[in-house]
Amino acid sequence: MQGSVTEFLKPRLVDIEQVSSTHAKVTLEPLERGFGHTLGNALRRILLSSMPGCAVTEVEIDGVLHEYSTKEGVQEDILEILLNLKGLAVRVQGKDEVILTLNKSGIGPVTAADITHDGDVEIVKPQHVICHLTDENASISMRIKVQRGRGYVPASARIHSEEDERPIGRLLVDACYSPVERIAYNVEAARVEQRTDLDKLVIEMETNGTIDPEEAIRRAATILAEQLEAFVDLRDVRQPEVKEEKPEFDPILLRPVDDLELTVRSANCLKAEAIHYIGDLVQRTEVELLKTPNLGKKSLTEIKDVLASRGLSLGMRLENWPPASIADNE
């Protein structure tokens, strides 16, 4: 085997043994020594905790107010029924939340096949038993909420946020969204030509049937690759803060003195002194304005009152006045 001593081996063989529709064994080799556990543990954790899926989150059963009760004519108690519903395997297309209904009467088992749903929902294991009716006159009706999520979310984590709005009789269920039911990996020895210190990673997994095992491995690897992508170039993934540029001058200073609606006499006196903008005016002092021909104390008082109503005054100092936009116009 030719190659640099610092060059890492890349897996060249990926073998997928489909034991059943829900059970598969994936073999990956060759791997550098130690990489079997590195990749195997990472993929195992992602498959168990980060895979998206659908799960039962709430149940309403007619005649049942709380989970610590029983229902006449039903063999199982309510806690056992909720536990059975927790194992319901559902595939939902195009929606994040659906409501399923179940109505059954007469002696016999109540299974997932008895659930009524629309075309966007598929019950993967219709033979899954929910409960048993033990009397000809017994019946059971329930509404089942199925939501899309990720990982495992216990009912206790949702109690505080939903307690105020949750009516009596609506029972919360621990939501196990992950479609992966069992995952285990093993690292075996591998050999390539003269090298005998290599790893072979064998991953064995079972799903609830809502996802193909091969697709589950592919999604987990994609999630891992996306999380590591930021480290490739060590780039900063944070969005840069956009700082708002504050204008150099208050917009009111850039408006013409005509906007002050002064008397004709006062306005004409200011224009005669080349005071065209409010910014020009506020930089003048009272003494300077009184030297303006035909502008007396009455006009000065008027100007001061108008400026004060806008939060301005005479004798202000403005750095870098006039701005380029005004200077160019002049």
UniProtKB/Swiss-Prot annotation:
Domain of life: Bacteria
Any one cellular-component term (Gene Ontology): cytoplasm
UniProt entry tagged with the keyword Nucleus: no
EC number of the protein: 2.7.7.6
Reaction equations catalysed: RNA(n) + a ribonucleoside 5'-triphosphate = RNA(n+1) + diphosphate
GO term, biological process aspect, one: DNA-templated transcription
SUPFAM superfamilies the UniProt entry points to: C-terminal domain of RNA polymerase alpha subunit, Insert subdomain of RNA polymerase alpha subunit, RBP11-like subunits of RNA polymerase
Chain segments carrying region Alpha C-terminal domain (alpha-CTD): 249-330
Keywords: DNA-directed RNA polymerase, Nucleotidyltransferase, Transcription, Transferase
Pfam families: RNA_pol_A_bac (PF01000), RNA_pol_A_CTD (PF03118), RNA_pol_L (PF01193)
Classification via InterPro entries: DNA-dir_RNA_pol_insert, DNA-dir_RNA_pol_RpoA/D/Rpb3, DNA-dir_RpoA, RBP11-like, RNAP_asu_C, RNApol_insert_sf
Alpha N-terminal domain (alpha-NTD): region residues: 1-235
Catalytic EC class: transferase
Molecular-function annotations in GO: DNA binding; DNA-directed RNA polymerase activity; protein dimerization activity
Keyword Transferase: yes
Function: DNA-dependent RNA polymerase catalyzes the transcription of DNA into RNA using the four ribonucleoside triphosphates as substrates.
Domain statement: The N-terminal domain is essential for RNAP assembly and basal transcription, whereas the C-terminal domain is involved in interaction with transcriptional regulators and with upstream promoter elements.
Complex and partners: Homodimer. The RNAP catalytic core consists of 2 alpha, 1 beta, 1 beta' and 1 omega subunit. When a sigma factor is associated with the core the holoenzyme is formed, which can initiate transcription.
Family, similarity comment: Belongs to the RNA polymerase alpha chain family.
Protein name: DNA-directed RNA polymerase subunit alpha
Classification of source organism: Bacteria, Pseudomonadati, Pseudomonadota, Gammaproteobacteria, Enterobacterales
